[in-house]
Structures are given as structure tokens and as C-alpha cells.
Amino acid sequence: PYRIKVLNTINFKKSMHYNPFAYLHSEKDILKLVTTLIANTKGEGKAGDDFWVKAETLLYCALIGYIHYEAPVEEQNFATLIEFINAMEVREDDEEFKNPVDLMFDALEAEKPNHFAVRQYKKYKLAAGKTAKSILISCGARLAVFDIAELREVTSYDELELDTLGDRKTALFLIMSDTDDSFNFLISMCYTQLFNLLCEKADDVYGGRLPVHVRCLIDECANIGQIPKLEKLVATIRSREISACLVLQAQSQLKAIYKDNADTIIGNMDTSIFLGGKEPTTLKELAAVLGKETIDTYNTGESRGRETSHSLNYQKLGKELMSQDELAVMDGGKCILQLRGVRPFLSDKYDITKHPNFKYTADASDKNTFDIEAFLSTRLKLKPNEVFDVYEVDTQGA
């Protein structure tokens, strides 16, 4: 049987809890989390202004580092990060003023002067009052979405157990809106942490390969935001029993997000399926990949004058196997499959209604629909500081 895990960013009432802070184990994990956050959210700095991004990175690393190493487990979440930023008052006319967060870092520096969070915070404090205020405004704008109480609650603790997906059969559903990208950064964070956690576990615990293959079916891949270093991940995860299937409406979507790395990502995919479409870039590249076929041409000619003459001409020419206009009007029941080491071939799409397990799906009958709210309501949820009794039962002596 499969374990069921669900992260639903459309309706948080139908979602389990996901806390990215629960998967921080080292300083590099903190940096990866900050990189993903910045890549998929918007601050107040001018687009392309590297200064604000680097300044925010320093502050986030300092605050998250403090929370990870010094705060109680129940306070290691985004809600605490928001409280830190809200408490960081800056007075432009008083450079000597210290806010509560400054005092906390001063106390930490006195105890642990080489602490990761202290070193990052001291670099941030090099900014003058007006600049520091601008950095805080940008951070506040980037994290404004966490003013929503539901989001703070769903990220307060973790139930997804991402690092265990390669240990036993698990079905993880990441549900996001296809019209609103406000919370898509959570999905991107989840994928980033999932890939990194599973790769590290495969190397450190299982000698290079996970015992249970993890297959990621990433539908609407372009809508989840950017997964940092995806071009490197797709090249290395396969050896660790992890595979990724990226589903796109057009290749241009991938290039819009990953720029020059889009070609590297596509090149590292062993299999690609064209289901149809009319986006020019996709059609042009596919037509080139399909190559050419040889055709025989037969020309006849007739010249009339005083005398009539006839001519015959046979010729072999190269023609695109399928031109762009032919690909654009390809039969909806057909697809083109490209496998590594095999020439592309035209195939029929599988009729899912003929699958022997189709009768178990919600498409076959509404009674098969999985009620996630009912599933979650039957699970015991422990809240921070909640008092409960623990009973030890010895079943061996019974």
C-alpha cells in the first residue's frame, strides 16, 4: 500500500503541513532554501539589480541560521522569520539604535563569535540606515504572502516527510493553481528540497541508489516557478533511482524560465513525447530532429514549336520527414516518441479507458473520488505545547 501525502496550495484546508525549515541540516541547506525563495518571489528592488538580491540573501541567511540553530523546534518556521523582520526597526537618524533582533545577535556573538548566523548578520549590518531600511522593505514585500494566516499555519510544522519518499512506496500530490501563482514558490521549494534530500540520502545511506524508485510527474512544469540548478539535477538524479517527467505546453515555456539552461535540461531527457501543438519553436526543433526522407521526383516536359519534343527527368531529393505545417495539424490521436538511441516514431495515443485499472479512477465513477478532507480529519494533529498522555504497552509479555 502507498502512503498518501498532499500539499494543496489552492485550498489549504485540503492540505497537509509542509515546513521547509524541517529539512535544514546544514548551512548549505539554508543557502539552498534562500536561493529558491528569492528565485520564485518578488522583492522591491529593481529587476536585475543584483545588490538587493545579495543584501536580502545575507539577511535571510542570518535570520534563518539563527532560527535553525538557536530557536526551539516548534518555532522553526516562516512565522518566526516574519516576526524577526517585523521587529527589525531601523532609524535613519540614529545609527547607534539597536532593535530587539540586534540585541539577540549581540548576545549570540558574545557567546559564539564564529556562529554562521552572526557572520552573515554582521555583513548585513554594514549597510547604512537608509539602505538597511530599503532591504527590510524588500524582504517584507517578498514575504508579504505570509501575512495570510492559513499559509503561516500550513507551514508551521511538517507532515510530508520528503526525506522518506525513497524508503517506502509513497504517493505525494503537489496541487497548485493554474491561474494564480501566488503560492507556487512553495511547490518549487518542495521540489528543490525533495531532489536534494533524496540525492543525499541515496549517497549517504544507501550507497548511491534508493531502494524505492522515485518518479516525479511534474505537470504544468512551467507554472511551478524555477527549481534552482535543475539542469544539473536532471543529469545526476537518474543514477540514484530518481526520474523526472516534465510536462510542458511548449518548449518556449522552459526557455522563458531557465533561459540558456533550457537546452541542457531537454538534452538530459532520455525520452520526449510530442502530443501535438502549434508553438513555432517547438515545431521547428522537432522537424529538425525528425530529419529527412528520400523521395523520387518524376518530371515530364513538352515543348511545342515547329517540332514537338518531350523530356523525362528522374531525380532523388531530400524532404523533411514531417514539415512544421504537417506537425501543426497532426492527428489528435497520434503522438511522436523520441527515445535515446532510437529514431523517432509515430504512435497511437493510449486510450486510458481501456486500462484494466481505469474502473478504479474518479473518471470512471464519482464514488472512487478520494476525499482528502475526510482523510485529514481522522488523523490526530498535535499542536505545539499541547499536553497529552503517553502509554507504553508491552505486547511481548501478553
What are these regions (language model features)?
Residues 234-336:
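Conserved ATP-driven motor cores of ASCE-family P-loop NTPases powering translocation/secretion/packaging/pilus
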Residues 1-242, 257, 262, 325-349, ...:
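P-loop NTPase motor domains
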